[in-house]
């Protein structure tokens, strides 16, 4: 009698493009069943899932607003009821609204903090207890080099990303005895739509490797941190930044 093959299931938020898409596709290639999250970018999320399926991977779409705590709880409870405890979650959804602090509106502060930082609680918290009962799991939050060193014109973004690092480190201590790892990835300047307006002649001199990072390079780290081989790595902040820090 052959044993049933158990496919580990993971959720990737903000998986409709950029780093999130790269992580979702790379995870599917590694054999995970990938739950591809989006909010407004349905067509792009469908493209992510289509690429996964075209490469003989498996997954599904899920839609919700990561800033809406009630909806997150409802959707994630339904997801857990359907699939059981997930093996992992990559909390990646994020936005920027840049301005100098003196000119930064309260709305732009709130929207960035709600989307980038509050979403960690809204998405991860409903998934923790099922993981604890199973005594296994991987939690990754995608922070930023801005959360480590701070960037001019990004007090809101830097604050939200630094908050993710603190949350990940604290949660890692709480969950270590349950064999659940919690780590933060802090990308540097990665070639995505988010940096399309950034002048390269200003940015590249600050990067020792003199090039932008690729989403796939961040995704490779995420796949490793999700793996069984990374079971003794927790409470860490690992930056993919070409030597900037």
Annotate the PLM regions.
Residues 129, 173-177, 231:
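Alpha-helical segment proximal to the catalytic Tyr-Lys
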């Amino acid at each position: 009698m052959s044993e049933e093959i158990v496919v580990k299931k993971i959720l990737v938020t903000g998986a409709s493009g950029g780093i999130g898409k790269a992580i979702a596709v790379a995870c599917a290639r590694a054999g995970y069943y990938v739950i591809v999250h989006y909010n407004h970018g349905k067509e792009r999320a469908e493209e992510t899932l289509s690429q996964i399926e075209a490469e003989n991977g498996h997954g599904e779409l899920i839609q919700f607003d990561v800033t809406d705590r009630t909806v997150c709880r409802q959707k994630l409870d339904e997801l857990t009821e359907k699939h059981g405890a997930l093996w992992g979650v990559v909390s990646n959804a994020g936005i920027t609204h840049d301005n100098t602090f003196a000119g930064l509106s309260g709305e732009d502060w709130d929207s960035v903090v709600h989307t980038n930082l509050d979403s960690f609680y809204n998405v991860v918290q409903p998934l923790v207890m099922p993981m604890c009962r199973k005594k296994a799991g991987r939690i990754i939050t995608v922070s930023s080099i801005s959360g480590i060193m701070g960037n001019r014109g990004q007090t809101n973004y830097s604050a939200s990303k630094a908050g993710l690092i603190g949350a990940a480190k604290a949660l890692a201590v709480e969950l270590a005895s349950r064999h659940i790892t919690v780590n933060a990835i802090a990308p540097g300047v990665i070639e995505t739509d988010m940096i399309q307006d950034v002048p390269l002649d200003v940015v590249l001199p600050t990067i020792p490797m003199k090039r932008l990072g690729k989403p796939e390079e961040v995704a490779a780290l995420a796949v490793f941190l999700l793996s069984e081989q990374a079971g003794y790595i927790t409470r860490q902040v690992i930056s993919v930044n070409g030597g900037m820090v």
